[in-house]
A protein has these predicted regions:
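Nudix hydrolase/Nudix homology domain
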Residues: 2-28, 97-110, 142-211
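Residue-level detector of short, conserved catalytic/binding motifs and their immediate flanks
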Residues: 69-71, 118, 158
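Acidic, metal-coordinating catalytic segment for phosphate/diphosphate chemistry
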Residues: 35-80, 86-90
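Conserved aromatic-histidine-acidic binding/catalytic patches
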Residues: 61-65, 110-114, 118, 148, ...
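A short coil-to-beta-strand element that immediately follows conserved catalytic motifs
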Residues: 133-142
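Short N-terminal binding/cap micro-motifs at the start of the first secondary-structure element
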Residues: 29-34
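Conserved Nudix-box catalytic region and its N-terminal flanking loop in Nudix hydrolases
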Residues: 80-124, 128
Length: 211
């Protein structure tokens, strides 16, 4: 980076800060994401890149003035989606034995300061948990801002839809979760056992998605 190059507040913070998680004040989030699922994701994405802060995770979990930014990657092959079941060995105790439709985690200070930190963090989280053998495309399809559950009150979900050319994948954390491709009807059969974000993704992204 040249001496004349300008960096965003997020990039400057990453270059100098201690370990932390990316979070955005609710005063910024709620006007941009007034419902539980917002399809127009670019305004909140831009706000995150320009105005996000990094705070210690232990504090962030208790501070309801902020929401931690979580990339939530949904995998699709043909008309099937990857359904995940978290085991008791998975770190987040509030999600044990729940079904999920997304892979993801926090954006933190090990992610690159150069370029798009959201893209970098999303890719890091995906690659830590699963290896997609042949990817076709990946795009941001919406934002989850839901306060139904305690865990949701401090997290904001950026929902990415990753389409795969083939069904092949490698589970890098088999002790933490199991995963298999399922049709929308098969997913509907376990709807009541799904975590809250997965329910939202099923209703807003999968159920009414064109074939």
């Amino acid at each position: 980076m040249s001496s004349e190059s300008k960096t965003t507040p997020v990039q400057n913070w990453v270059l100098n800060a201690k370990e932390g998680v990316m979070a955005l004040p609710r005063t910024i989030i709620d006007p941009l994401c007034p419902t539980r699922f917002t399809r127009e994701a670019e305004p909140i994405r831009a706000a995150i890149l320009s105005r996000a802060e990094f705070i210690e995770r232990s504090k962030a979990e208790q501070d309801f003035r902020y929401k931690q930014i979580i990339p939530y990657i949904v995998l699709q092959h043909a008309r099937k989606f990857l359904l995940i079941r978290r085991t008791p060995k998975q770190g987040e105790t509030r999600l044990h034995d729940k079904f999920s439709l997304g892979i993801g985690g926090h954006i933190n200070t090990i992610d690159k300061a150069e370029g798009d930190i959201l893209e970098t963090g999303m890719r890091r989280e995906l690659n830590e948990e699963i290896k997609v053998h042949r990817e076709e495309a990946c795009r941001l399809v919406g934002v989850i801002n839901d306060d139904t559950k305690e865990v949701d009150r401090v997290h904001l979900g950026l929902v990415y839809l990753l389409t795969c050319k083939t069904p092949g994948f490698t589970n890098r954390e088999p002790e933490a979760y199991t995963a298999l491709w399922q049709t929308p009807d098969e997913i509907a059969a376990v709807f009541e056992q799904m975590e809250s974000w997965a329910k939202i993704v099923y209703e807003e992204v999968i159920r009414n998605k064109p074939a």
